[in-house]
């Protein structure tokens, strides 16, 4: 006798229509905190998240970025097909993250990547297929020329969904992609542009 349990966790408010619910987390997905990533807004999580990607099987998989501010001093590099990077929700908030009064009750909520010193928060390598990035906020940091999400070239069947990009030099850079979907994304406060 065997049993299979699929446990569901959600980070959304419990309204009747689930309008505030962007994503769920199951026990068959990998959580980047299990690899040492810490969403404290201070610790560099680049190596931990890249280790999580390296641990995925050759056919890809799903990695979850839980709620918190995950700082990057180097890009998250996606170098496998069929990889999904999924936040629990993009944590809609204003451009101002207040410091003082105990950080005004802490981070603004949602799953946030902060490209502190990284030239890109997420870089999808040339030739990758089936890469999905969803339910995240991507914010710039101290690197003056950072890119939020960079599809480096000749990618196929990629998808960006429910992404918020803010305070970046370039929000999304896509080179030579085929069958790319961009759905429900909002990019603002950029000195450069949204897409190339």
Regions found by a protein language model. Give the residues of each.
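Surface-exposed or flexible loop/turn and strand-edge residues in extracellular/cell-surface modules
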Residues: 27, 60, 67, 73, ...
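Bacterial signal peptide processing site
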Residues: 13-15
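N-terminal extracellular ligand-recognition/capping segment immediately after the signal peptide
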Residues: 50-53, 57-103, 111-118, 137-138
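Right-handed parallel beta-helix
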Residues: 82-88, 129-140, 156-169, 178-196
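Right-handed parallel beta-helix/beta-solenoid
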Residues: 17-48
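Glycine-rich beta-solenoid repeat tracts in large extracellular/virion proteins
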Residues: 75-79, 92-105, 120-127, 145-154, ...
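Sec-dependent N-terminal signal peptides
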Residues: 1-5
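C-terminal motif of bacterial Sec signal peptides marking the signal peptidase cleavage site
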Residues: 7-11
